[in-house]
Amino acid sequence: MVLDPKEKMPDDGASGDHGDSASLGAINPAYSNSSLPHSTGDSEEPFTTYFDEKIPIPEEEYSCFSFRKLWAFTGPGFLMSIAYLDPGNIESDLQSGAVAGFKLLWVLLLATIVGLLLQRLAARLGVVTGLHLAEVCHRQYPKVPRIILWLMVELAIIGSDMQEVIGSAIAINLLSAGRVPLWGGVLITIADTFVFLFLDKYGLRKLEAFFGFLITIMALTFGYEYITVKPSQSQVLRGMFVPSCPGCRTPQVEQAVGIVGAVIMPHNMYLHSALVKSRQVNRANKQEVREANKYFFIESCIALFVSFIINVFVVSVFAEAFFEKTNKQVVEVCKNNSSPHADLFPSDNSTLAVDIYKGGVVLGCYFGPAALYIWAVGILAAGQSSTMTGTYSGQFVMEGFLNLKWSRFARVILTRSIAIIPTLLVAVFQDVEHLTGMNDFLNVLQSLQLPFALIPILTFTSLRPVMSEFSNGIGWRIAGGILVLIVCSINMYFVVVYVQELGHVALYVVAAVVSVAYLTFVFYLGWQCLIALGLSFLDCGRSYRLGLTAQPELYLLNTVDADSVVSR
């Protein structure tokens, strides 16, 4: 229903299990279907995913900080941080080190900080409203824009899933010394993902502990490579804290843009806003909401600090060992060490170009087989952890946008099939060069989808009717708007550079047509965002107002269990 600001609102006691129906207003009359479905009584079983249990928060009076409470809130941030460690990020890291040395570490640091600030907004939306970003989008946008937005986010998730499958398949191929072909690795990844996804049947904390275990494996394996290579610590610190890039040309600039595109993942905003709902927070109590926001932010800081250090390990290893190395130098070292992969590189004086597969091979040539196998274990952990969180993202997005009751098994079958089929075809009919080359295209795809997460999250967290006193202040609105504009511009530059490299007129025409449609939709979302940021004159004199509710006191949705997600 559409909320009339003049209507008398039901009080807390009368709102019932679906009291948020009144609080979910609309931008315009097209939003008349935005309320939650009415209760059908006890005959309908609750349907949940990830939220079968909620972690209780210990009560401690007169404490501004408690490690017990921090531990209770720990989990969602580390699951979110997996997206900063997926195979796409690892490939971006090693290419950054090989192309620019230590010079772009400050870009990685800046991108991680920007990502942290955006994740803060996503977590706050979930905590304050009790709804994750996809659910809010379902209730706010009209049907056609909502479906387009859902398709764009699904495309980003599928693209990310393909990167994760590629990374896992390459890792399995390296670990088996080539005995398991790439297509075999793809099939193995399908099977083990189903096994891992049902770990939460044994409890939410055990699932979060398993993700923590995978992050620990990445830290140990990539940390081992870091210790083995022994990069210059002064160079690492200089590259991290001195924002400059002397002697950088187009390849280095493109790599810097690629770092931003790889680090800030669109589906991660949807994921994090849903994960925070796994903690017991009484949204009727502003102090509890404020406390939850604080601890979730602290946890996110810790989690992204860990992911940043792991990324620094990878960049530094390839910066120290392989920056400005030529193919001929690598071939000689590989032959001297009797490596079976010496013929992987052309024997010329062109600069070494590396990817996840070649990176492991080169490490094996220079530092022994142990370095290769440990690298592969780290890549496998990155691929497995990120493919699991990607599946959760897909489930939350589908449930939120479509209000669709789908089992996780069916959801995984669908998205995995879409992601696996093209990856499997390339693995069967092409070689590892083409498989790893898909990562470049997929990074561009992720960059294109970024506005479809950043603009909605900034829009809804800036609305006082949605967030009440927890809405973004004027400083956050201005900074957030500038931030979104810069990030989207950087990523569009990345896309333009990629399209120019295609070198075919027909592809230019297709790209131009798609760009017009793409920019039109981004403009629509941006227009709605600017209205939310306070530029009300842009509403063209329409009578509706943007927001979930016309009465801010209902923002907490404190009488509704908004965790309406599907059963397995």
Swiss-Prot record:
PTM comment, free text: Ubiquitinated by WWP2. N-glycosylated.
Lyase in keyword set: no
Gene Ontology molecular function terms on file: cadmium ion binding; cadmium ion transmembrane transporter activity; cobalt ion transmembrane transporter activity; copper ion transmembrane transporter activity; ferrous iron transmembrane transporter activity; iron ion transmembrane transporter activity; lead ion transmembrane transporter activity; manganese ion transmembrane transporter activity
Biased composition (Basic and acidic residues): 1-20
Cytoplasmic membrane side: 1-69, 118-154, 195-208, 277-301, 382-408, 462-482, 528-568
Catalytic activity line of the entry: Cd(2+)(out) + H(+)(out) = Cd(2+)(in) + H(+)(in); Mn(2+)(in) + H(+)(in) = Mn(2+)(out) + H(+)(out); Zn(2+)(out) + H(+)(out) = Zn(2+)(in) + H(+)(in); Ni(2+)(out) + H(+)(out) = Ni(2+)(in) + H(+)(in)
Record function comment: Proton-coupled metal ion symporter operating with a proton to metal ion stoichiometry of 1:1. Selectively transports various divalent metal cations, in decreasing affinity: Cd(2+) > Fe(2+) > Co(2+), Mn(2+) >> Zn(2+), Ni(2+), VO(2+). Essential for maintenance of iron homeostasis by modulating intestinal absorption of dietary Fe(2+) and TF-associated endosomal Fe(2+) transport in erythroid precursors and other cells. Enables Fe(2+) and Mn(2+) ion entry into mitochondria, and is thus expected to promote mitochondrial heme synthesis, iron-sulfur cluster biogenesis and antioxidant defense.
Other notes: Nifedipine induces duodenal iron accumulation and mobilizes iron from the liver of iron-overloaded mice.
Assembly and oligomerization: Forms a complex with NDFIP1 and NEDD4L, in cortical neurons, in response to iron and cobalt exposure; this interaction leads to SLC11A2 ubiquitination by NEDD4L and proteasome-dependent degradation. Interacts with NDFIP1, NDFIP2 and WWP2; this interaction leads to SLC11A2 ubiquitination by WWP2 and subsequent proteasome-dependent degradation. Interacts with COX2 and TOM6 at the outer mitochondrion membrane. Interacts with ARRDC1; this interaction regulates the incorporation of SLC11A2 into extracellular vesicles through an ubiquitination-dependent mechanism.
Protein's recorded name: Natural resistance-associated macrophage protein 2
Gene behind the chain: Slc11a2
